[in-house]
Amino acid sequence: MKRVVLAAVTVSVIFLIAACSVTTNTTNDHKNMNDNKTLQTETATTPLKVEKGPEVTLIAKEEKQKLSNGVIVPVWTFNGSSPGPEIRVKKGEKVKVTLKNELSAPVSIHWHGYPVPNNMDGIPGVTQDAVEPGKSFTYEFEANVPGTYWYHSHQDSVNQLDRGLYGALIVEDTKEKYDKDYTLLLDEWVTDKEEIKKQLKEMTKGQIGNKSKGDENTKKNDDKNGMDHSGMDMGSDQKDSGNMAGMDHGNMKMEGHDMSMYDLFTINGKSGDLVVPLKVNKGDKVRLRLVNAGYLSHDIHVHGHDIKVIATDGQPINNPKVIKDKVISIAPGERYDIEFTANNPGKWYVEDHSKNKGAKGMKAVIEYDGSKEMKDKADEKGKLAKLDMTKYGAKKLGSFTLNQEYTATYNMDLNTQMNENEVVYTINGKVFPDIDPIQVKKGDLVKVKLVNRSKMDDHPMHLHGHFFQVLSKDGKPIEGSPIVKDTLNLKPGEEYEVAFVADNPGEWMFHCHDLHHASAGMVTEVNYTDYKSDYVPNQNIPNKPE
């Protein structure tokens, strides 16, 4: 079994935001950036770029991008913008995406939510080596599962995703017909110059090249550059773990762990007046695909219309019911598909409800043909009820039941703890790579109980290569439609049981998609004991899966 040792990162480093230097380049990562490059200053009439597959080339390169009026930042992009192009393919097509790296650092592409073959999953040090500057790599898979997915770099992903290396992947079902079909990628950025300077200064500390577990140099590298996670056991049930056990960061002074530093929110890489209107005609059947590519949850409210949530994480909801004036809470990594009929002419907001000042910019406008004056009122601080997905849609028998017989059962206790003034995020009291993997064989039926024991942190847990069915929440069976997902958010104190079939052999990550948490330990693996990979990590490449 191959494992990759994650970087042990200081708290300040964990929260660096390299994407967001407003006026100057102060890091080695951008030392080759040409300040005279063309600025990406699209107007509000420029749509999200779409690449219709099945063969696509993505070029990773540095650019500057106008996020809002007066805010231009250096970004890392696919094909010159963040987000990168929306890749649209049809069910049944054989997809071929060639990644060319023109950046100064290695990159990769992970197909978030889509069950690709293991060697196409894009995890440096686990399924492939990161693609070095000047090199290329081709990803190939069949698009057999329609839905809303997305792609992003999984090399040093806590930073590269923040820098802008992501885009949407849409697998179209040819039987579904919509007059308008829009994808909205949600993200957050930092614009405060002093905060940016502090973050960028901290970037140079504690950076560790992650090596495979068998590398003899790993320990030496860790000792020189930062804390070594290996051998650390902080199980809250162990008496000898001392003050480390159960110590939640909410009770600690932790510099930089203030997510309000993300003060500018974007939709498709734009904020405020630069967000592209969603143009419709009266009578249109409209689909909105909402993708959270950021690190904060967003409570999205569609004004002026009765809507249905028809899918979550690309998987359909059974007989969804009409709702109005409720927010849909979308956690990092999650996707929600919304459908409505355009039957209320005018201009209407689609907005985030949040106390964070960045929410002012996370607004799109549903704009009917011929409409002129905006009469709708923005209300990002208004309190609305949240849609409870555990009771939404019509109940029916899913692939699994709560009390059926399972081949394997596992528990995952998620926590925020301290070790020698370092914040770490643990599963069963340990950090990766010392967390025991979930071991399966092809065909196994697997049930996992997840409990969030952190006092203040959400943990959006993402399983690679598989879909799971949500069976229960806080001990109560799901009352509505079967819920099938690949990313599930656990708020403090919450408990879920999920089940999946081991039908995609490989070595798969199961981790928190607040990548700050993943980079500080909250990662495990689902390993097939009857699978053997041909991949051997190149020890000369600094593979950093988180």
Predicted regions and their residues:
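Histidine- and aromatic-rich segments of cupredoxin/plastocyanin-like copper-binding domains
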Residues: M120-I123, T127-E132, E142, L186, ...
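Histidine- and aromatic-enriched segments that form or immediately flank copper-ligand environments
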Residues: D29-H30, I59-T174, S297-I328, W348-K360, ...
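Positively charged n-region of N-terminal signal peptides that target proteins for export
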Residues: M1-V5, T10-V11
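Acidic-aromatic/histidine active-site loop/patch
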Residues: T183-K282, V291, Q417, Y425-N428
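Short beta-strand segments of immunoglobulin-like
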Residues: T45-P47, P83-R88, L274-K279, S399, ...
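C-terminal motif of bacterial Sec signal peptides marking the signal peptidase cleavage site
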Residues: L16-A19
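Bacterial signal peptide processing site
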Residues: S21-T24
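Compositionally biased low-complexity segments at domain edges in trafficked proteins
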Residues: D179-N210, E380-T409, E420, P542-E546
